[in-house]
Amino acid sequence: MTNKEDSTQKQYQDSPIGYELALLLKIANEPGMLGKVTTIIGKFKSNIYTVDTVDVTHEYTLREFRISTSDQEEAHKLSTELDKHDGVEVVHASDITFQMHRQGKIEISNKVPVNNHADLSHVYTPGVGRVCMAIHENKDAVYSLTHKANTIAVVTDGTAVLGLGDIGPEAAMPVMEGKAMLFKSFANIDAWPICLDTKDTEEIISIVKAIAPGFGGILLEDISAPRCFEIEERLKKELD
């Protein structure tokens, strides 16, 4: 790993946003208890972003705190210290970044509802057959009769992911999902991660050419140099 990559990796590891916590605390409903909790949080040099009251009874107040800490170890120490304090119970603690990634950050959704048999006959068989034949007779019709015109394949082999280096296709998926989210959020373009379990240049080129009919564009993402340049140039020449 180069000095630049090592510096970038440390930047990601040390970022306070990477250790933003959601803490659900059950606090005794007594005067001064909220102040005691915030004082404990302050001792750990943590910032409180928000405090939301979830429930109130005569005995306790249930509050959700959104907090940033310096690192993961400090977050664990803070949670442990709060739980030891009389009148405070940590009901749940979660890393907000990980919470956002549970079950993935993107999904495929239908643009047309399928509520009954008639709808099904239009979007699938038998009606879809006529659409297939229209594209068979005129391949350019695929851009107006399918999702292709608005779809991008985000292709990686996981060899040069951000400042993390060669971490493999599975570990690259969260970044590729994030890239797909940017396409959707800022341009309303549907993008999907294609994470390849190969580092072979010829195999990557072959795979991308094989999947190209299903996408309007191909984004080569986080493939290590110098292979990335050869792959890009070859695909520019060999794809339309």
Predicted ranges, named:
Residues 2-102:
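A conserved regulatory-domain signal marking ACT and ACT-like small-molecule sensing domains
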Residues 60-63, 75, 79, 89-239:
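Metallocofactor- and cofactor-centric catalytic cores in central/energy metabolism, strongly enriched
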